[in-house]
């Protein structure tokens, strides 16, 4: 699994590739919390378009990122979920907790500051 961060205007996109499972979900959690809590980024989008598989520990990392963002009044969105990842979130009844977008354009539009 690989994680990289890039800044687009007022938001940070974390690009994740590979599987998110028990062996590496702490890395995802750390990257999310680094952006939200340490760097104070108020708009974070997690790009899951290159993620093949996510297990319950990966879902827990996403929930922790969501909780941290809500605690600090930040926005945290997901985009690019494949059918498998979407189904994992749906079965766990967590899909409705997240703002989920099909692609980066939609996610960035949702995070754009209102004028």
Residue ranges and their predicted role:
Residues 1-15:
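Short beta-strand/loop segment at the start of cytosolic alpha/beta domains
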Residues 1-5, 33, 55, 108:
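Short low-complexity stretches enriched in small and charged residues
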Residues 4-6, 79, 101:
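General small-molecule cofactor/ligand-binding pocket signal
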Residues 8, 49, 105:
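Conserved catalytic submotifs in the C-terminal HATPase_c
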Residues 100-115:
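A charged, well-structured terminal subsegment
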Residues 22-98:
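Amphipathic alpha-helical interaction surfaces in cytosolic regulatory modules
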């Amino acid at each position: 699994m690989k994680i990289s961060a890039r800044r687009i205007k007022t938001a940070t996109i974390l690009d994740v590739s590979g599987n998110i499972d028990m062996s590496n979900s702490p890395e995802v959690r750390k990257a999310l919390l680094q952006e939200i809590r340490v760097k104070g980024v108020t708009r974070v989008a997690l790009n899951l378009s290159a993620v093949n598989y996510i297990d319950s520990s990966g879902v827990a990392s996403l929930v922790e990122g969501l909780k941290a963002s809500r605690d600090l009044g930040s926005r945290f969105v997901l985009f690019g979920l494949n059918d498998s990842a979407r189904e994992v979130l749906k079965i766990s009844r967590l899909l409705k907790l997240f703002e989920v977008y099909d692609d980066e354009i939609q996610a960035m539009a949702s995070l754009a500051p209102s004028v």
